[in-house]
Amino acid sequence: MRQSLVVLCIVVAVAGACSGDPPDKEMQQAQSAIETARAGGAERFATTELKGAEEALAHARDAVGQRDYRLALSFALDARERAQSATKEAIDRKATLREEAERSLGSAQTALLAARNRLKAAEVSKVQARILAESRSNIAAGEGRVQEARTAFEQGNFEAASAAASQAATALAQTARDLDALVAPAARRRR
């Protein structure tokens, strides 16, 4: 009799611990936070945090299936927190990439203007047109890369914008140096 009373107390205690409602509200909040993180670019910029949030929400659902609502609540709250962290991380990363792309575009634009100015100086110095043809071609290609970078920037693809702008800046700077080398001997010959 005593043993059955102890078993009955344990069963009542376990049933009492498992009673209550599943944390539906918290799980919905976690799901909403995950969707917000995805919309904010977390799949691309904060993959680790987003994956952690999705896994925590899956664990919460599993715990609800096992009627362990306390554990489900804990996982749901963790999922929501991780999703919010993923959103913030994605926003920060995008802002950093945007700033880098803006700097790269500025450098490319400066290099383009410098190359154009060097070309004009070479023309004024009466450097032969056939010699300048390659420089004109390089400047046109650089303009195309700068335009590609601007297009990528406008589409929000800041990594591609930075890459295209950096390539353009490097190539245009080399063209400007090449033109300087052509102008210097021509200037010495006139003296």
Region locations from a protein language model:
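Sec-dependent bacterial lipoprotein signal peptides
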Residues: 1-16
